[in-house]
Amino acid sequence: MKVAILYSGGKDSSLMAVILDRLGYDVELVTINFGKYDSTIPARTSAKNLGFKHKVIKLDQQILEDAVEMIIKDNFPNNGINYIHHTVLEILSDEYKVIADGTRREDRIPKLKFNEIQSLEDRKNIQYLNLTGIGYKTINDTSDQLFEIQKAESDINTSSDYEMEIRVMLEELGYDTNEIFPQHIQSRVIGWKKNE
């Protein structure tokens, strides 16, 4: 059965790909882009190095614009990022019957609540899988065993998640993204860990 995994090139979505691949799913890594900035390069590189099929899906830039409006209003990114994630899942559920992502137990954003997951699955007759039952310590330990990981301060070149195009649009509108986004480290999968 084919599964579309929302893919940023990070360790969480990479781990989800490995788990589902080993369970026999036909894994297709999917990176979303809105045409504002080609944020897909890190994900494409990571997917290639891991040997997974990768697809970029371009969506209407209005989704990004609506999210940026929310972020400007809130002066904080959470609601805007969650809006994008919910919208992307709704759109992908028209094409895929199984959708997954790397959201984990401690994640706050992007994340669906339990009732939102049930609603999505029931309304669209799909399956939605994530890492909700797994905590960051387990994900870090497992990822460290499997992947070569690069860690860097978040910027538009370190990840392929929604944040990157949001940052570009905010900067074009004259906003200092460092005042809106809390500083954080992005982990990107470079490839499989080599046996020593």
Question: Where do the language-model regions lie?
Answer:
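Nucleotide-activated chemistry modules centered on ATP-dependent adenylation/adenylyltransferase
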Residues: 1-5, 9-196
